[in-house]
């Protein structure tokens, strides 16, 4: 993964990283802030996935109006979640083979990992043992789950280690995403990674989403559904449920994996629910979690991504104290079948970002 122009500069005792987005645009971030925001992203993943876990796929094409029970102690369950352990395997592949390693090395480590996989990831594992490698392992000809949510929920690390470097994100997602996905399934990973990348420097959630949109093809269905959510938010600025109803009426039946049923693990609809949570959540941690979860479908993955965006924007040190404590309490717990804990993942991601 070749980095854009990046340098470390010392200003009056404060070490900063400067990033050249273009010949005429430079971005700067202190190394302390960079690490805090990376930690906020990983923490958001852990908090969000455990917040929504009891509701996952229990609310299909219907809003969740039931009570949601969560405590910071629940964060300990994040070590069992594929939203996190798959991408930590990809970090392990980088550690072992280097940042420029070919995609098949990542696929090999994914295939041989001891944890359970589902959907597009499970097919990518089977494809490896059948001798089908990237990019064909994610092609619909060999993986009918190619539009599923898999890469979208495990591309976070790419955004975390590429602050302000959208082209790096596109290049890396194109390589890794084709292990298990194709088309909108890859665009979801690019879009989410670009949200994180923008969130290092931008607090306006509308602008963060616009940056994400600019990173994927405008004519793609993924871009279309995100634009629809933004339009619905403008039309119903205080009524997310009305926006949800119109969104579901148009896009609720797009998942080939759930054809003929209400089941939907499609990347773009679940991505739209992430955007809905971000827009209507108003940068409030709990409000963002609640709305994203109540949208239903893959309702542990979606709040996990949504709060990770908030975590990067705010930084770990600005998350609610009880959330910080819940993460710190399990900070050294190792995610299953990986070598990484929260603390070591933050450190490694930070080092790769430099």
Predicted features along the sequence, with ranges:
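Bacterial Sec-dependent N-terminal signal peptides
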Residues: 1-24
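Active-site-adjacent bridging/hinge elements
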Residues: 22, 55-70, 122-136, 161-172, ...
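Accessory "access/gating" subregions that flank catalytic or transport cores
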Residues: 29, 138-146, 162-165, 174-178, ...
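Mature N-terminal segment immediately following signal peptide/propeptide cleavage
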Residues: 29-52
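Mature, well-folded catalytic/scaffold domains that follow N-terminal targeting or propeptide regions
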Residues: 38-39, 89, 134-138, 144-152, ...
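Catalytic phosphate/nucleotide-handling subdomain of diverse soluble enzymes
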Residues: 51-53, 58, 62-68, 180-184, ...
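Active-site-surrounding "flap" and adjacent substrate/cofactor-binding loops of secreted or lumenal enzymes
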Residues: 53-88, 103-118
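Extracytoplasmic mature domains of secreted/periplasmic and thylakoid-lumen proteins
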Residues: 98-154, 158-163
């Amino acid at each position: 993964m070749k980095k854009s122009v990046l340098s470390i500069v010392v200003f009056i005792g404060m070490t900063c990283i400067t990033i050249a987005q273009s010949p005429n645009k430079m971005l700067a971030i202190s190394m302390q802030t960079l690490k805090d925001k990376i930690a906020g992203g990983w923490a958001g993943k852990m908090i969000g996935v455990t917040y929504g876990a009891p509701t996952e796929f229990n609310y299909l094409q219907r809003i969740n109006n039931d009570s949601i029970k969560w405590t910071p102690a629940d964060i300990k369950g994040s070590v069992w979640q594929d939203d996190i352990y798959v991408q930590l395997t990809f970090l392990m592949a980088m550690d072992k083979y280097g940042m420029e390693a070919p995609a098949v090395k990542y696929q090999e480590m994914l295939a041989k990992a001891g944890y359970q996989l589902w959907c597009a990831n499970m097919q990518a594992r089977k494809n490896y043992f059948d001798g089908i490698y990237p990019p064909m392992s994610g092609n619909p000809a060999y993986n009918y789950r190619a539009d599923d949510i898999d890469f979208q929920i495990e591309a976070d690390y790419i955004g975390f280690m590429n602050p302000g470097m959208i082209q790096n994100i596109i290049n890396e997602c194109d390589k890794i995403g084709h292990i298990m996905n194709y088309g909108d399934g890859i665009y979801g990973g690019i879009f989410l990674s670009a949200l994180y990348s923008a969130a290092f420097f931008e607090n306006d959630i509308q602008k963060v989403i616009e940056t994400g949109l600019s990173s994927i093809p405008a004519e793609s269905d993924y871009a279309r559904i995100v634009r629809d959510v933004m339009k619905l938010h403008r039309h119903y600025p205080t009524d997310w449920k009305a926006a949800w109803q119109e969104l579901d009426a148009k896009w609720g039946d797009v998942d080939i994996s759930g054809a003929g049923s209400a089941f939907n693990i499609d990347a773009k609809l679940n991505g739209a629910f992430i955007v809905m949570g971000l827009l209507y959540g108003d940068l409030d941690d709990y409000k963002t979690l609640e709305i994203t979860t109540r949208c239903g479908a893959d309702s542990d993955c979606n709040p996990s991504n949504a709060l990770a965006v908030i975590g990067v924007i705010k930084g770990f040190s600005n998350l609610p104290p009880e959330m910080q404590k819940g993460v710190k309490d399990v900070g050294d717990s190792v995610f299953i079948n990986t070598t990484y804990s929260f603390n070591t993942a933050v450190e490694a991601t930070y080092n790769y970002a430099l």
